[in-house]
Amino acid sequence: MKEKEAKWVVEGLVTEGHPSGMFRVQLDNGARVLGYISGKIRRKAIRIMQGDRVQIELSHYDLTKGRIIYRLPPPPIPKPKDSEDDSED
């Protein structure tokens, strides 16, 4: 059997949504690529929206297109500090 080729996995930010599950992704290195949703994400009905951080798999042959393989969880929202500690009685 033929060995599968290793692919690059990079992270980026979804900047635009296009029809048919295509997205414009701004990679962390500054490059912009066109990403499409992988089959597992499509089957599990995971929503990808503008502003989401994703992992995208790029081939060595075409660095302008890639497959979105994972949507990263959003960063935790910091809790506001309690005002009870600051009040003077």
From Swiss-Prot:
Domain S1-like: from-to ranges: 1-73
CDD domains according to UniProt: S1_IF1
Subcellular locations according to the entry: Plastid, Chloroplast
Keywords: Chloroplast, Initiation factor, Plastid, Protein biosynthesis, RNA-binding, rRNA-binding
Listed GO MF terms: ribosome binding; rRNA binding; translation initiation factor activity
Annotated coiled-coil segments of the chain: none
Cellular component terms per the entry's GO annotation: chloroplast; cytosol
Gene3D superfamilies according to UniProt: Nucleic acid-binding proteins
The organism's place on the tree of life at top rank: Eukaryota
Family listed: Belongs to the IF-1 family.
Subunit relationships: Component of the 30S ribosomal translation pre-initiation complex which assembles on the 30S ribosome in the order IF-2 and IF-3, IF-1 and N-formylmethionyl-tRNA(fMet); mRNA recruitment can occur at any time during PIC assembly.
HAMAP family given in the database record: IF_1
Task of the protein: One of the essential components for the initiation of protein synthesis. Stabilizes the binding of IF-2 and IF-3 on the 30S subunit to which N-formylmethionyl-tRNA(fMet) subsequently binds. Helps modulate mRNA selection, yielding the 30S pre-initiation complex (PIC). Upon addition of the 50S ribosomal subunit IF-1, IF-2 and IF-3 are released leaving the mature 70S translation initiation complex.
Protein name: Translation initiation factor IF-1, chloroplastic
